[in-house]
Amino acid sequence: MFVKIGNATDVAEGNIRAFDVDGTKVSVANSSGHLYAFDDTCTHMGCSLAHGKLDGTTVTCPCHGSQFDVTSGNVLRGPAQRPVRSRAIQVEGGAILAET
């Protein structure tokens, strides 16, 4: 099931923004005009990935430097050992719809 979480214009290119999806923080990253959604909480120590740095399709956690691929949620560099949950996303009529 998909729910509206915001508008595509809410996430500028090269940025990440956290939204609430049924009580869970979900980050949406805009990499070169493509939007990717993933759970906002780093699997290492629980820091918000929305406060991290986006470089292409790699987000770096601001707390301890773990890196994740925003397209899949996979860990690219520790200390995190587990991926973040990647979520399907759609844009319809300018609205961002994320998988619950």
Which role does the model predict for each range below?
Residues M1-G56, D69-V70, N74, P83-T100:
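N-terminal pre-ligand scaffold of iron-sulfur
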Residues T58-T60:
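Short loop/turn motifs at secondary-structure junctions and domain boundaries
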Residues N15, P62-C63:
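Short amphipathic alpha-helical segments, especially helix-boundary/capping motifs
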Residues M45, C63-H64:
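Short Cys/His-rich metal-coordination motifs, predominantly Zn2+-binding knuckles/fingers
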